From Swiss-Prot:
Belongs to the ProQ family. This is RNA chaperone ProQ. HAMAP family: ProQ (MF_00749). PANTHER family: RNA CHAPERONE PROQ (PTHR38106:SF1). It comes from Shewanella amazonensis (strain ATCC BAA-1098 / SB2B). GO terms for cellular component: cytosol. The gene is proQ. RNA chaperone with significant RNA binding, RNA strand exchange and RNA duplexing activities. Residues 102-160 are annotated as: Disordered. The keyword Cell membrane does not apply. It comes from the Bacteria. InterPro entries: ProQ, ProQ/FinO, ProQ/FinO_sf, ProQ_C. Residues 105-129, 140-153 have a biased composition (Basic and acidic residues). Pfam families: ProQ, ProQ_C. The lineage of its organism: Bacteria, Pseudomonadati, Pseudomonadota, Gammaproteobacteria, Alteromonadales.
């Protein structure tokens, strides 16, 4: 004899009721108010059905009748039905008032939970470490000139040059020779680092290297 698997999940039991009693239990859309004492009828009709137990049927029925969809159908003029969809009398005002109060309470609780969840998410976002804002520089610092360390070093003063310097001849010059270069009004001391044809490369004492013709070299 094949054993029948018992349904334990409430959603699966509701799906079974939708299929077995489609005129009573509505899967989608507007539901119908159920007959008072329907659980007893349901237990008797499914007494030999090994798929469901009375306990699970009670849980499934409670979920069905506490849903917003069901509570909204409890209104004036609605008629209760039995397992086969047969009418079993109109709703009493007391039951309508109770259903509306239950619906409002449930919706208010859901709204409060959503608000609390949004607040918690907002608090979590506020507590998350944020990148510190860059402190604005004072106007005086923004307008200040670059630091002295970024400037090229001032050229040291050239040593006093004798007044009897004369232009050199190319053949008199050699690498590493100390010479003076005529730059502007005053000669500047330096050392020859290279001689290429008629051009003489001189590294001045300031660190600057210049290329001049031999006639600008003073000895």
């Amino acid at each position: 004899m094949e054993s029948t698997e018992k349904l334990t999940d409430t959603n699966a039991i509701l799906a079974y009721l939708y299929e077995t009693f489609p005129l009573c239990f509505v899967a989608e859309g507007e539901t119908k108010p159920l007959k008072i004492g329907l659980f007893q009828d349901l237990a008797e009709r499914l007494a030999d059905d090994s798929k469901v137990s009375k306990t699970q049927l009670r849980v499934a029925l409670r979920r069905y009748t506490s849903s917003w969809r069901y509570l909204k159908c409890i209104k004036a003029g609605a008629v209760r039905v039995d397992l086969d969809g047969n009418p079993c009398g109109e709703l009493e005002q007391e039951h309508i008032d109770h259903a509306q109060a239950t619906l409002k309470e449930s919706q208010d609780k859901a709204k409060a939970k959503r608000a609390e969840r949004s607040k918690d998410e907002g608090d979590a976002a506020d507590k998350a470490p944020r990148k510190p804002k860059r402190k604005p520089q004072p106007q005086a610092r923004r307008d200040a000139k670059p630091a002295a360390k970024d400037k090229p070093k001032a050229a040291p003063k050239a040593p006093a040059v004798p007044i009897n310097l004369v232009p050199a001849k190319l053949e008199e010059l050699k690498v590493a020779q100390r010479v003076n270069v005529k730059l502007g009004m005053s000669p500047v001391a330096g050392s020859i680092v290279d001689i290429n044809k008629g051009d003489v490369h001189v590294q001045l004492d300031s660190g600057l290297t210049v290329k001049v013709r031999a006639e600008y070299i003073l000895l």
